[in-house]
Amino acid sequence: MATELDKIFLILEIAEFIIGMLGNVFIGLVNCSEGIKNQKVFSADFILTCLAISTIGQLFVILFDSFLVGLASHLYTTYRLGKPVIMLWHMTNHLTTWLATCLSIFYFFKIAHFPHSLFLWLRWRMNGMIVMLLILSLFLLIFDSLVLEIFIDISLNIIDKSNLTLYLDESKTLYDKLSILKTLLSLTSFIPFSLSLTSLLFFFLSLVRHTRNLKLSSLGSRDSSTEAHRRAMKMVMSFLFLFIVHFFSLQVANWIFFMLWNNKYIKFAMLALNAFPSCHSFILILGNSKLRQTAVRLLWHLRNYTKTPNALPL
């Protein structure tokens, strides 16, 4: 029987699911229609579309996971059900995070400017570098999946206290192994965060340098390049903020689930954890001029449609 807390948790999770679906479906439809119309797919649109598709898959996994935790939490600790759900969530989360990181790096090389030869060399080979990052993310996904599988197997043994002999004799050893595996998982999650943070820092340096050059040339501090810098910085900063909340919520959720299994507290951690796939799409829409203009036109048409009287004149 669902409690009041379970009902509130499910309502909030459904709201996050709807919000995330609206934003990501919109991004996917706009980019696909533009690609069909222009008979050409740009790199940024391709990454955005892949990110939207990956996030949509993650949102469905999150919704199923939420109903499982909210209505049948006792089934979560079973090997046959808990393990595949956690593995599937981890795969979609890994892809979403790395695609968002690649998008941040792409915008950095597209907008920022440094006269250094290394930057110009990387910028010239930007598409190939993005492909290499995605290949690296796939290798890390395989490594993470193997580590996570061992992590889940040990954790479910600890949670299953019916095996008292194993629990009393080997619990300390198992917890030590869990700590090592958890550190490995955290390190691989830190790689995309550090790449995005580096992009943001260089964005800031590029903006400062560009603004100083404009002031020295008496052109003011507002031009198209400056505005592009600022929009991209806001987008990357918003992504990093959500990613930090997402990362720490994931660590807290893992600790609560595998160490305490407190059904009440893990719901709050999941709500914070799932804010990233739900809200990130709207940051992308606001930061992309094409998506932003399309969204404004759509809202304008919807507003006019709602104002149209339904009654037909006699």
Curated annotation (Swiss-Prot):
Stored SUPFAM superfamilies: Family A G protein-coupled receptor-like (SSF81321)
Membrane-crossing segments per the record: 8-28, 51-71, 102-122, 128-148, 188-208, 239-259, 266-286
Classification via Gene3D superfamilies: Rhodopsin 7-helix transmembrane proteins
Presence of keyword rRNA-binding: no
GO molecular function annotation: bitter taste receptor activity; G protein-coupled receptor activity
CC annotations in GO: plasma membrane
Entry-linked InterPro entries: TAS2R
Parts of the chain on the Extracellular side: 1-7, 72-101, 149-187, 260-265
Keyword Oxidoreductase: no
Main location per the UniProt record: membrane
Topology within the bilayer: Multi-pass membrane protein
Assigned keywords, A-Z: G-protein coupled receptor, Glycoprotein, Membrane, Receptor, Sensory transduction, Taste, Transducer, Transmembrane, Transmembrane helix
Ranges of the Cytoplasmic topological domain: 29-50, 123-127, 209-238, 287-314
Record localization: Membrane
Cysteines engaged in disulfide bonds, as pairs: none
Other observations noted: Most taste cells may be activated by a limited number of bitter compounds; individual taste cells can discriminate among bitter stimuli.
The protein's role, per its UniProt record: Receptor that may play a role in the perception of bitterness and is gustducin-linked. May play a role in sensing the chemical composition of the gastrointestinal content. The activity of this receptor may stimulate alpha gustducin, mediate PLC-beta-2 activation and lead to the gating of TRPM5.
Family: Belongs to the G-protein coupled receptor T2R family.
This protein's name: Taste receptor type 2 member 42
Source species: Pan paniscus
